[in-house]
């Protein structure tokens, strides 16, 4: 295959950095540019082991001139858009920030790609949360043609970004694809998210905060399986199509806490109930049969194995996560804007 030149936005974040690492390992002839604003969840340390093999540009997807300039200077032909604000609880506190980044930012990046020209694929990463939620006591799941029913500012902002991507395909012919994914876990995940938060707290014998709605369930996918899915869509996916990326593995938040405590040999007394957040969705589950049928993809990392490896990674990499837990609040607009609240979790 002819080498390609990829721009990976959000490339210093959790999933983006894992994707950069995955792609450079499996496609060593390709030129990869990680593009990231380095807000609080972006971290250049996530790319330490591949920095010598990639280019890095600190940039904002909401900066039309900067994004277009980067696309032109690096002769980009594939854009993979991981850039997003994704913390549900912060979205309740500051909805405007999420709509600016996730909707306006995505539209601006699309426009930059349209103006730069030469884009063979614009791939957009989205979430199962755009569909709303499902009843706990049902076997229903979301399909690619399920209606959008977002219930929170974050969900609505991601839904808006999806619509912008489709509009640029229908109106301007930009060759796009979209994947909607379930909850990811794995190494380098910022410790505002539930699995690293539980793990880091438990390592230090600190409480594991569980929302009062402990029965709420999520579908869990290892980040490497997600990277494989995006690879499959980039290589073989049909332009204009949406593909769901899920594992079929559902666990409640209480069950996640139990797994973490068992892996670390910590007592259940560390679990503590905290007030629920507004708009907390009950359940998500994706029908991922389309990507399996058309592209031959399926999740391959068993949940138990993936969780054991993930917990061990955090045990072995305190030097990576401890500074994030300790970071004090700084002024708006600097590289790091939010400290980790050890009593708050994001799902």
PLM regions and their residue ranges:
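Generic structural signal for helix capping and beta-alpha/helix-loop junctions
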Residues: 42, 132, 186, 218, ...
